[in-house]
Amino acid sequence: MQRAASAFAVGDFRKSEELCKAALSMRSDHLEALSLLGILNARAGRVEEAAVLLARVVQAAPINAVAHNNYGNILRDLRRFDAALASYDRAVKLEPAYAEAHHNRGRLLSELNRADEALSSYDSALKLKPNYAEAYYSRGVLLHELKRLEEAAANYQQAIAINPQLADSHYNLGNVLRDLRRYAEARQSYDNALAVKPGFAQAYNNRGNVLQELGRYEDALRSYEHALAINPDLAEAHINSGNVLQELKRPDEALGSYRRALRLKPGSELLLGGYLHTKTLICDWSGVEGETAELHRRIAQGRLAAWPLTVLALIDDPALHRQIAELSAKGDDPVNRLLPPIIGHAHHDKIRIGYYSADYCNHATAYLAAGLFECHDRAAFHLVAFSFGPDKRDAMRDRLSTAFDQFIDVRAKSDREVAQLSRNLEIDIAVDLKGFTRDARPGIFAQRAAPIQVSYLGYPGTMGARYIDYIIADETVIPAKSRPHFTEKVVYMPDSYQINDEKREIGEAVSRLSLGLPVSAFVFCCFNSCYKITSSVFDCWMRILTRTPGSVLWLLGDNATAATNLRKAAEAHGVDSRRLIFAPHIPVAQHLARLRAADLFIDTLPYNAHTTASDALWAGVPVLTRCGESFAARVAASLLINIGLQELITTTEAQYEEMAVRLARQPSLLAEVKSKLLKNRRTSPLFDTKRFCRHIEDAYTQMYSRFCAGMDAEDFRVQKRKQAQ
């Protein structure tokens, strides 16, 4: 048996097995041979055979702690957890100083979600064997699962200090550092893991993820390529390649990556949604109807098949929107919160408002809300901006950095650290301006950054989260029939929920000729992102063009592939593709100026124009919308009601088509609508920033008064003020 043990030690498992069998052929009850052969069978995946062998050892040597420990390992592999725990308990009872048995017992208890007992077992193992690297590693894994990130990192670091050759410790340390948003350190940990284990595909994959977070997209792509060279079937690396290719504005290649991932692992979280979003981004509608039905089915089954924002653009169903939001919020649920509940929060004469966003720069949210931040009554409110987006030094960033009492860059802080900072600053009301949009940080609010937490502006739907108390809305975007589909208490603004900045600059006038538009044609436009253009919307647009000879459709040139696909689709409808004209992205003031060259903005469904509708109305261009069921499908209607253009709200495709054709065919009707718009633009609530600011301050005051009185959050309506004060 010494030769068998030696062969095992050097990795010659075949030789070791032969020698064990030879020993057993001479003596069938040879315990050492039975034990080692059981371990060899387990290593080879023959777990049932291993269990039989190790059971014989335990029966023959009932007071052998090692035998009970080994048998416990096999029972754990067989998922016979109660029996496994009994074996480990027997092992440590027989030999209380048996560190390995304490460690294995801890691993099993961790699997059983008995975290406190598992930690106690790990502590026992480490007390007995202070340089037990594997126990520190296992303790780190459990602490990571418990979201005790700093402690997890310390345990992985201790394991590495004892044994620098543990690749998994380097790798998992990288994962914790990534979660702590310490991306450069995380990358170094992945590099360390790869130095120990060059063929570690998952380490290359996660290394790519942190490089992506650092904005090093080409480097991230190369890291994913390394992962796939090692393991071409690693679905996560295909998915992440798709994500980074999206960032690199290479949607065609991204689609290919998602397709490969779907073949390998079709049920991956978020994958079907990411694939569909990419298809709609390039206006590739082939198979989308069936794929959307499958997405709906998966969400209805309780599967996180898409990011909530993706679903808003595909399916007009408020109940489904709530379901996908709740599934998304589950990962940040308060049960995972580490910070204790807020107790004894100080009351302030000035209400302390925290606005949380990644978009304090040239971004749609900033264009809308800049005036709000500047108009707040500083005698009654103290404003703090928490910025977790890139530090883009543009004109809007410069403007916003002076619009708050405090402007804090929290990019490098973890969700828990941001929440703790908010508590230290005694923020009364935390306003999430992101929701489930790009670069969102819902984990901050799951940690309860403030006693009152509000969803506003960024995400047009419910967050589905117990930690969000209120949503700012209006009677149009959340009508009574939709109220059951929102988990938040609803604050109904007296006018539109959407803030607008009355200071927005419109550039110098530009001619149609300079924009590549026909001088005398009727110009329909839609500057929504391409993913909002569905095949049914485009079909309707083509019927409108067919019925209005000589008209053109002016669209945003999101990407070349989308333009190509839309031109092909136009030709398939018998419409000359030259009647589709694509505009490049340009600075906002110039964009507002060029918008005036259009005659009519025609909206999309189920995801309406939001900021783009406000842009058009501010520029004096009427917006024709079709109002749907969900928040995202009703925003343009809210805007039109509050600028006095209800006649441009339709509820069916036929109404929408007929109104577009009428406005194109009847110049006097269009002129009347435009005249009304220009008159109302300066007098209606929609572009009265100060009036809106006073109303939302009234909302904040009522929220805070309820909190100070010990009352729970409830729906309420903000009373309309006659004029800004």
Where in the sequence are the language-model features?
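Donor-sugar nucleotide-binding helix/loop cap in glycosyltransferases
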Residues: 602, 616
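Short beta-strand->loop
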Residues: 527-528, 556, 626
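Substrate-binding clefts and catalytic carboxylate motifs of secreted carbohydrate-active enzymes
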Residues: 525-536
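Alpha-helical solenoid repeat scaffolds of the TPR/TPR-like class and their adjacent stem/linker regions
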Residues: 1-518, 529, 539, 567-576, ...
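A conserved nucleotide-sugar
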Residues: 380-382, 542-572
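Conserved hydrophobic helix-helix packing surfaces used for dimerization/oligomerization
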Residues: 351-355, 524, 553
